[in-house]
Amino acid sequence: MMSWMIALSTVQVHANSELWSSYLTQPEKWPQKSALAKQDILPLPAAAIVDKDLAELGRILFHTPSLSKTGDISCASCHRPSVGFSDPTRVSIGINGQEGHRNSPSLLNVDLWDVLFWDGRSTELHIQATDPLNHPSEMGATPQHAEEQVQNLPALTQAWQKAYPDKKVNWPDMALALAEFQTTLRGADTAFDVFYRYAKNQDYAKAKRALTDTQLLGMHIYRTKAGCVNCHNGELFSDQEFHNTGLHYFGRRFEDLGTYELTKIPADMGKFRTPMLRHLAQTSPWMHNGLFDDLKGIVRMYSNGGARPRRPKDLDSMLDFPITSDILVPFDMSKKEEVALLEFLKIL
């Protein structure tokens, strides 16, 4: 029995050694990633340089509940700093206790997004700011109301004068200040970022100390057999594209057809922007509707090829039905590989 255990341990050490050897090299020489991925996973870039006075005005605006119609909802109500500027409730709560129908995503690294919101309805941070301000179930206010708050609150008036000494209070410039503040919300380097940079600089001794054996195996599974990298790649661990994972609840109480609600293109039914996988440990629940609070459940859903609702039998044949993306295919994992993948996701 003892000799069998020693032999098994020797095989395991050899496997770990081989995997480390394949990754203790420059990233472009790492094992081939899944063929469907347009790019590999990448570290965060350096934070942008910002106007400090403008960002400070934006910070105060972000935390000011009186911008809302009822005076009790601020940007920070749904993007809480303590949880990675995300919302720990399944769906966000607006004025008068109204429930939204989507979970508020993290604002960390938000300046790196090409498209904003789950449905991609905005491409600019300063333009995006008007949407929650106006939305009747979020802040329920108007730009004019927001301008009045700056004029009436001493802290905001002072911050405005420092940021815009020669301008009258106006909403477009308030929105620019909010965008400037959000540009400062860069997440801290993760163990992956540290590993990548040391590997890139060929400092392999330090690279090896950045990840555990289990985390490295998880990264390998992520990039290869699990195919996570197909959609979750780049600096944000998101391809910034739109996919249907089958969680649209078509024809049911919580139906949400995603970007189709904007485009009215049948192929867009049920599609949502690929979420960032950075800061997962801080930002549960996950998915556009806050459906999951356990990463294992998400991993197992995808290992089965995603959710695949059936077309209702009574649905008129002339009507469209959202189809789960064919980029999602089932894959097999051992228990050890599943644990490793989860450990890697938790350090992002």
Q: Where do the model's predicted regions map?
A:
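Bacterial N-terminal signal peptides
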Residues: 1-9
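Periplasmic c-type cytochrome electron-transfer domains
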Residues: 11-348
